[in-house]
Regions:
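Non-catalytic alpha-helical scaffolds and adjoining flexible linkers that form interface surfaces
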Residues: 1-26, 31-236
Length: 236
């Protein structure tokens, strides 16, 4: 775990979520390039004339400074560090979904620089409306990989090469199996796994089955508590 024990200045961050704290402040959950997910208190941010109030926007690349040695740090300043990325419609819904995944699955104060950079690119793609479903699948795969839950796509659970014409039953902790063993698995054809492993989502079948597979795996790692954004992205 990365220990945040002193003033951290000009850190690249994204705001994942904010919520009220006491009478005039906010708790700000951020994803930072160097320190991963960090919880900050923005003192007085809910006051009408607060300089922080208009800056704490999700999906925008920001620079923040904070200090503290406990789990809840104190935010000292925040500013834009890139051009504004407009988010609307499905892109906005997807942004909320990805932010909630990070809040739910990322441990606090661990460095995920590679994932941060991937998130940055993902936000740019979403703001431009670039193939939203494929953008989601790529981020979901990257997130699980960074968390140590790699989705193995080129070999089955017995280390045999995936065959395009075979049907598999994918289990979260085992991978692709040729025979059905449990209800906690999802049916997928070999060609879909091969396509995903090659970052190829052109096929309509692959697009649909990859969505179902990733939804199944994400739900497995989330556990019993559903996402708050679930109703928003059911059709994504």
């Amino acid at each position: 775990m990365v220990k945040v024990t002193s003033l951290k200045e000009n850190q690249q961050v994204y705001v994942l979520h904010t919520y009220p704290f006491k009478e005039t402040s906010l708790i700000v959950e951020i994803f930072s390039k160097e320190f991963g997910r960090v919880s900050l208190v923005a003192k007085g941010a809910r006051r009408p004339k607060s300089a922080l109030r208009g800056m704490l926007q999700s999906f925008q690349a920001l620079e923040a400074s904070w200090s503290g040695i406990g789990e809840l740090k104190t935010l000292h300043g925040i500013d834009w560090c890139d051009q504004y990325l407009p988010m609307e419609g499905n892109s906005l819904i997807c942004g909320f979904y990805l932010n909630e995944l990070l809040l739910r699955l990322l441990p606090k104060e661990d460095n995920y620089e590679s994932l941060f950079n991937f998130y940055h690119t993902t936000m740019e793609n979403l703001s431009q409306g670039i193939n939203i479903e494929v953008t989601l699948r790529r981020f979901e795969l990257k997130l699980l990989l960074e968390l140590g839950y790699e989705v193995v796509l080129k070999a089955d659970a017995n280390s045999n090469e995936i065959k395009a014409d075979k049907t598999y039953y994918y289990e979260a902790e085992q991978g692709a199996l040729e025979k059905f063993r449990t209800e906690k698995s999802i049916k997928v054809i070999g060609q879909t796994l091969i396509d995903m492993g090659n970052d190829n989502f052109d096929s309509a079948t692959t697009e649909l089955q990859s969505k179902n597979l990733m939804r199944f795996l994400i739900n497995y790692y989330l556990g019993d508590k559903p996402l708050n954004s679930k109703q928003l992205f059911l059709n994504i």
